[in-house]
Design a protein with these regions (language model features):
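Short alpha-helical donor nucleotide-sugar binding micro-motif in glycosyltransferases
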Residues: 81, 256-257, 264-269
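Membrane-proximal helix-turn-helix segments that form the acceptor-binding/catalytic region
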Residues: 118, 132-150, 165
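Conserved donor-binding/catalytic core segment of Leloir-type glycosyltransferases
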Residues: 1, 190-219
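Short hydrophobic beta-strand element within catalytic cores of glycosyltransferases
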Residues: 294-298
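Carbohydrate-associated surface elements
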Residues: 38, 157, 177
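Aromatic "clamp/platform" in nucleotide-sugar-dependent glycosyltransferases that forms part
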Residues: 277
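Nucleotide-activated donor-binding/catalytic signature segment of Leloir-type glycosyltransferases, i.e.
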Residues: 239-260
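Conserved acidic donor-binding segment of nucleotide-sugar-dependent glycosyltransferases
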Residues: 310-321, 330-335
Length: 374
């Protein structure tokens, strides 16, 4: 049984990670029940649906961030975990915590994923820089993690973060993985961009993704007249980002790119910028790297993605548009270095982040935790 406090459209990292795991386990012949608050899944075979919380005047804000908050229902939870060999909790929120409690009471092994930092939650209440609130949030998370039999950490960064606060765990560091279609392939740059440098950033238009720093940096670049910034995504900060983009000589492009178009974009782009101020894993960054696109990554202490940089020229001072502009200019001024490092990035990613291999590791973790070693 997979427990998802957040599940809906595949437009956020947690939902994507959950659905990739669910599909992979199903393809391997396992029977998977999904416990979630997604009303659209009501009556769909394999799904057990709990209600969502009514937050009154905050409902609109929560919806604009692309999530729903689950309200535990013990009867639905018991039905979902009945006969399960293992329960895997995606997030340590109220539904996941209650499912873990009921599963443990029935002697069912439980594992849990560490997919969210405290700041991913506290940023929505504008308190991501308040250390006591972040510590309290981790304390709440720990109530779930302390009762489970194994913890899945998508990055070593997250394992070090949690174990630094609460001590050693039975942890497994396994990437959520990159789909095999994200790889270098010959793609012609569209005619409209032939005389432009295309810079891509992928992710929800949200405070923590910090795309504003890229738009500000583009305006400071020596190549500003030729920079075509493409912000692939959607989200609540779109209006503000569009306003910032009006300062640029070349209007930035906004919008969601279907899978195949995203692969093409990452193969004809010139640079990828990962500007997030906080990031648990950053699959979008790994997708770009896997296509052989040189990244410039925020060095924020709250970002796991900085570990993907193979050279200091792929890191920028996370709060400095000027520093980012300098890094952009260097890479654009050195196309041979860009091509050489792009190949190195693609080769490095192919060995570590293949989704099929990562899902095999996830299956092994679940079987080991369930007491059924592969």
């Amino acid at each position: 049984t997979i427990v998802c406090d957040v599940l809906g459209e595949e437009n956020n990292g947690t939902t994507l990670a959950a659905m990739n795991l669910i599909r992979a386990l199903g393809a391997k012949g396992h029977t998977v029940t999904i416990l979630c608050p997604d009303a659209q899944k009501q009556g769909v075979p394999g799904y057990a649906v709990v209600p969502t919380r009514n937050l009154g005047i905050f409902n609109g804000y929560v919806k604009s961030n692309g999530v729903q908050l689950a309200k535990p229902d013990d009867a639905v939870i018991r039905q979902a975990i009945q006969g399960a060999d293992i329960v895997h909790v995606m997030l340590p929120f109220v539904l996941g915590r209650r499912a873990a409690q009921l599963a443990k009471a029935q002697g069912i092994p439980v594992s849990a994923g560490f997919h969210a930092m405290a700041e991913n939650f506290t940023s929505h209440i504008f308190m991501e820089n308040c250390a006591p609130v972040n510590r309290l949030t981790y304390h709440v998370f720990s109530k779930t993690y302390k009762m489970v039999d194994a913890i899945h950490y998508p990055t070593q960064f997250l394992r070090d973060l949690y174990e630094g606060m609460y001590g050693p765990t039975n942890g497994y560091v396994i990437s959520n993985g990159v789909n095999a279609s994200f790889k270098p392939c010959p793609v012609q740059k569209p005619e409209e961009y032939r005389d432009k440098f295309v810079i891509v950033a992928t992710g929800r238009y949200s405070k923590e993704k910090n795309q504003a720093v890229l738009l500000e940096a583009a305006n400071l670049s020596r190549h500003r007249e030729r920079l075509q910034v493409i912000l692939a995504g959607s989200g609540p900060k779109e209006k503000r980002l569009r306003a910032l983009g009006k300062k640029l000589p070349v209007a930035p492009k906004f919008g969601f790119f279907p899978h195949d178009q995203m692969v093409e974009l990452l193969n004809y782009a010139d640079l990828y910028v990962h500007s997030a101020a906080m990031e648990a894993e950053g699959i979008s960054c790994l997708e770009a790297i896997s296509c052989g696109l040189v990244p410039i990554i925020s060095n924020s202490p709250r970002c796991a993605t900085k570990a993907y940089a193979l050279t200091d020229r792929s890191l920028f001072q996370f709060d400095s548009p000027k520093n980012l502009a300098a890094k952009i200019d260097w890479w654009l001024d050195h196309p041979q270095d860009r091509a050489r490092w792009g190949s190195r990035y693609a080769e490095n990613a192919a060995g570590q982040f293949d989704q099929e291999k990562c899902m095999e590791q996830m299956e092994r973790m679940l079987l080991e935790t369930a007491g059924r070693r592969p």
